[in-house]
């Protein structure tokens, strides 16, 4: 598993978050909870007052370390209506408060019709008689290829929506907040418009989301997730350089707390053990004892919400909730170290490393970070550090350069 996230020049916060996920993967599992209804949450209030977050505390006496948030109302023909905008603003408010408290925001995007013709993301066969979209993103390609036709209406609509969501991430980035982003989720499932075409076409769409956000908009604070159905894990893969985490959504029957080891092993093998593996949506939680017995220790789990009449968190037995949230192998919010205190463990990129003695440092405004020789992040200045060798990471004319200095 890579020591650094796939995003080039990731923010310090993103590096810390990725390092935390990597450090604990296979040893401990991060507890999560999805949010749904925002009507009971007051803008700017403590995220712990959200009904879905409170649910976990009421059942267990502990808060989840990871909280799921959705851009469900951030795009589509009604995105600019006050209620919809308020929903998204509340989600961003929760993300900020959660990060400040040492937690992890995890974003999903139920992406509505990019042409804004329908306020829907489901295709007709999955809409259960409700509103659906017939948007076909393949109309954004040049005929017979997966090369984008930048003059097409489909491409322009897709890019406009991507840019809009990217702006929310950039707002968080300015405040030092990082998060997890799971775009185009449940890839290969025949219910969302982004999965109606081929795996090759899906992969091109995923790469467009990543490239537009990271390389054009400058989003550097997200940990990226590829979330396919089990049958499409390899055939729809956008490329390992586009995601940090491989995840699956599994909804067992109520009170079924099995580890889902077969899915874990399938995804681990598909990634050749090079990716963090997560259970990004679930009903009942996998019992921690089962996970460790079966050697299927998910990076995190996240039951879907209890609000909006959601029944999923209630599908976990009371005793299992309590025993798991009080087990040292499950990470709750109370167990989180605090991002200001956490030291990232990364391996310096020696391909751009030069050797020099430590002079009086100039241009400190360009310094990205100081690391010890084992890759531990130490801060942005060598002041107060003892004599020895350090890796100084600097941004020079837009490029990141690592230099090994000896401080006398």
Model feature map: region roles:
Residues 32-34, 182-184, 188, 206-233, ...:
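Aromatic-lined carbohydrate-recognition surfaces of secreted/lumenal glycan-active proteins
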Residues 231-290, 313-350:
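Glycoside hydrolase catalytic-domain groove-lining segments
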Residues 351-408:
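C-terminal outer-membrane/trafficking sorting elements
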Residues 16, 47-56, 89-93, 164-168, ...:
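Alpha-helical scaffolding within the catalytic cores
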Residues 36-38, 72-75, 111-114, 185-189, ...:
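Solvent-exposed loop/turn segments at secondary-structure junctions
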Residues 1-88, 96, 288-291, 327-350, ...:
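N-terminal module-boundary/linker segments of secreted carbohydrate-active enzymes
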Residues 29-33, 64-71, 104-109, 179-183, ...:
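Structural recognition of the beta-strand scaffold that forms the well-ordered cores
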Residues 72, 76-208, 215, 219:
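Substrate-binding cleft of extracellular glycoside hydrolase catalytic domains
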């Amino acid at each position: 598993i890579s020591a650094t996230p796939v995003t080039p020049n990731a923010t310090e916060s993103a590096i810390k978050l990725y390092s935390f996920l990597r450090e604990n993967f296979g040893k401990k599992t991060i507890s999560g909870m999805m949010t749904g209804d925002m009507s009971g949450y007051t803008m700017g209030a403590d995220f712990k007052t959200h009904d879905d977050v409170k649910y976990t505390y009421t059942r267990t006496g502990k808060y989840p370390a990871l909280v799921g948030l959705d851009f469900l109302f951030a795009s589509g023909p009604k995105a600019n209506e006050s209620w919809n905008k308020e929903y998204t603003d509340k989600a961003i408010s929760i993300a900020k408060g959660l990060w400040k408290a040492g937690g992890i925001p995890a974003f999903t995007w139920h992406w509505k019709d990019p042409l804004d013709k329908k306020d829907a993301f489901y295709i007709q066969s999955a809409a259960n008689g409700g509103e659906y979209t017939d948007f076909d993103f393949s109309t954004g390609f040049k005929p017979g290829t997966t090369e984008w036709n930048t003059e097409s209406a489909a491409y322009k609509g897709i890019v406009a929506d991507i840019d809009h969501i990217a702006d929310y991430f950039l707002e968080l980035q300015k405040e030092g907040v990082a998060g997890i982003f799971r775009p185009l989720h449940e890839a290969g499932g025949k219910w969302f418009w982004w999965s109606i075409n081929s795996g090759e076409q899906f992969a091109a769409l995923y790469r467009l989301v990543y490239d537009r956000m990271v390389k054009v908009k400058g989003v550097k604070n997200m940990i990226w997730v590829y979330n396919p159905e089990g049958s499409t894990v390899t055939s729809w893969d956008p490329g390992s350089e586009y995601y940090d985490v491989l995840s699956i959504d599994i909804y067992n029957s109520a009170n079924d707390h099995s580890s889902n080891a077969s899915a874990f092993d399938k995804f681990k093998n598909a990634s050749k053990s090079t990716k963090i593996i997560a259970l990004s949506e679930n009903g009942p939680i996998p019992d921690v004892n089962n996970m460790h017995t079966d050697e299927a220790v998910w990076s995190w789990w996240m039951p879907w919400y209890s609000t909006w009449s959601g029944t999923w968190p209630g599908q976990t037995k009371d005793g299992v909730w309590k025993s798991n949230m009080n087990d040292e192998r499950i990470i709750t919010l109370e167990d989180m170290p605090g991002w200001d205190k956490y030291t990232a463990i990364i391996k310096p990129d020696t391909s751009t490393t030069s050797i020099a003695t430590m002079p009086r440092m100039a241009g400190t405004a360009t310094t990205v970070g100081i690391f010890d020789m084992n890759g531990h992040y130490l801060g942005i200045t060598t002041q107060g550090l003892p004599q020895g060798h350090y890796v100084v990471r600097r941004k020079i004319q837009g490029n990141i350069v690592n230099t090994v200095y000896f401080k006398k």
